[in-house]
Amino acid sequence: FLDKNPDGGVIFFESESAITKEIIEDRDIDSSRMVVMPVTTVQEFRHQAITVLDKYIEQKKSERKPILLILDSLGMLSTTKEMEDTQAGKETRDMTRAQIVKAAFRVLTLKLGKAKVPLVITNHTYDVIGSMFPQKEMGGGSGLKYAASSIVYLSRKKEKDGTEIIGNIIHCKNYKSRLTKENKVVDVRLTYDKGLDRYYGLLDLALKYC
């Protein structure tokens, strides 16, 4: 995104306390074009994201610079009620979280579309119990599933050079898409020393179709 938009920027909503300026710069990303905003609850993320979008929409279209919003991750976000219950020593589960997530994305989807700003979200998955064939499902209820234009499920296997583990092969299944064919699987390679290999698999395609 930053390569294709030299005047653009990224706002990174971070709930896992895992991103630092050093990590960003070690991956050859210009940290001056990336703002990291810590969030702890769904409500806090919703408020901050809406504030960013409202200020962006207030600008004249000719003055708007491209921005990308990222949330990592939805699965780690608590709720205000859960935080209050934990502080009070209660062990009750917050049964309203799915409704809060759904309400948040009802509002955000409209504002993102109006502003023409993309939002990328990472989330946790779990195995659905009780079906004959185990299936993966996203956490947080159905709100994000209905709001998203594309959903990609990721799984991985170790990539080895002899006996040494050098990275991972990541299986990317296009679970939902309004833009392309669904249920297609693409493998990408992520090595520890070089990062994402953008050319992985192209040779196999050339040999298959040429």
Residue positions per predicted region:
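Conserved inter-motif catalytic segment of the P-loop NTP-binding fold
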Residues: 5-93, 99, 103
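A conserved segment at the C-terminal end of the G1
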Residues: 1-3
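Phosphate-binding/switch region of NTP-binding enzymes
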Residues: 94-209
